[in-house]
């Protein structure tokens, strides 16, 4: 299930003033004193994701920005909706926004997807090394296998069952090149420290045919997100026609 927020800034400021950690903290603040209130302290999959804020240009007073939040937990989305529905104004990094529109909705499973935020995968988690498209040793099959292994692991943790999946998670993938690059370096500020997270963006992630028994798995990844750090807003995907 998904939640779309239309946020109207009450002043002008630069786009980089709000980062992924800002949005994650905002979502956790909405969950306070709910059944999901202690989620941030739990060392396990969170099973939710959010998109990049769009359009990706500077904030202008009175001009709407949009944010999508998704989760396979319907109740999680319901809690956020109820909290936000009672608020006329929200703060993100001390910048005030009017909640001009709030919408809950579900999407049908399609066989093609596009990234709404970079997909993050570790090449070596112990060493903190991310898979980078432009590394000399980049291996597309290794990337797809890591993507699949991570998705299956999360699915099993959520449903306590094996997913039905025939073949690879995707049959065709095509990178999205922005400013001449596929790799996206995102600077995250947390507790006064900054660190870089490296992800990749894709204009096409396609499974040629999704069988009826596979739809549950693809609905899950569409709601949960792909790769690592989903609750930090990485790996958000949208279905395309």
Swiss-Prot record:
Which keywords does this chain's UniProt record carry?
Antiviral defense, Endonuclease, Hydrolase, Nuclease, RNA-binding
**Entry-linked Gene3D superfamilies:** 3.30.70.1890, 3.30.70.1900
Q: Which GO terms describe its molecular function?
A: endonuclease activity; RNA binding
Q: Indicate yes or no for the key word RNA-binding.
A: yes
Active site residues of this protein: 28, 40
Identify the Pfam families for this entry. Answer: Cas_Cas6_C
The GO annotation for biological process reads: defense response to virus
Give a yes or no for keyword Cytoplasm in this entry.
no
Q: What's the Enzyme Commission number for this chain?
A: 3.1.-.-
Q: Where is this site: Transition state stabilizer?
A: 46
What is its EC class? hydrolase
Role this protein plays: CRISPR (clustered regularly interspaced short palindromic repeat) is an adaptive immune system that provides protection against mobile genetic elements (viruses, transposable elements and conjugative plasmids). CRISPR clusters contain sequences complementary to antecedent mobile elements and target invading nucleic acids. CRISPR clusters are transcribed and processed into CRISPR RNA (crRNA). This protein processes pre-crRNA into individual crRNA units.
List the NCBIfam families hit by this protein, alphabetically: cas_cas6 (TIGR01877)
Please report the name of this protein according to its UniProt entry: CRISPR-associated endoribonuclease Cas6 2
Per the UniProt record, the lineage of the source organism begins with: Archaea, Methanobacteriati, Methanobacteriota, Methanomada group, Methanococci
């Amino acid at each position: 299930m998904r939640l779309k927020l239309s946020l109207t800034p009450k002043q002008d400021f630069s786009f980089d003033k709000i980062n992924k950690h800002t949005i994650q903290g905002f979502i956790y603040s909405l969950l306070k004193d709910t059944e999901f209130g202690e989620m941030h302290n739990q060392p396990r999959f969170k099973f939710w994701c959010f998109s990049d804020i769009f359009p990706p240009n500077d904030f202008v007073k009175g001009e709407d920005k949009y944010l999508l939040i998704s989760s396979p937990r319907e109740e999680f989305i319901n809690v956020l909706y109820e909290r936000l529905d009672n608020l006329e104004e929200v703060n993100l990094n001390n910048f005030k926004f009017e909640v001009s529109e709030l919408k809950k909705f579900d999407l049908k499973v399609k066989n093609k997807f596009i990234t709404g935020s970079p997909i993050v995968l570790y090449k070596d988690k112990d060493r903190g090394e991310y898979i980078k498209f432009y590394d000399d040793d980049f291996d597309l099959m290794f990337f797809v296998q890591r993507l699949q292994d991570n998705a299956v692991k999360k699915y099993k943790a959520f449903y306590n069952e094996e997913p039905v999946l025939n073949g690879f998670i995707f049959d065709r993938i095509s990178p999205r090149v922005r400013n001449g690059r596929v790799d996206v370096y995102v600077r995250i500020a947390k507790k006064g420290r900054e660190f870089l997270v490296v992800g990749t963006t894709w204009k096409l992630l396609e499974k040629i045919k999704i069988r009826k028994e596979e739809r549950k798995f693809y609905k899950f990844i569409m709601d949960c997100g792909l790769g690592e750090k989903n609750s930090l807003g990485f790996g958000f995907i949208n279905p395309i026609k």
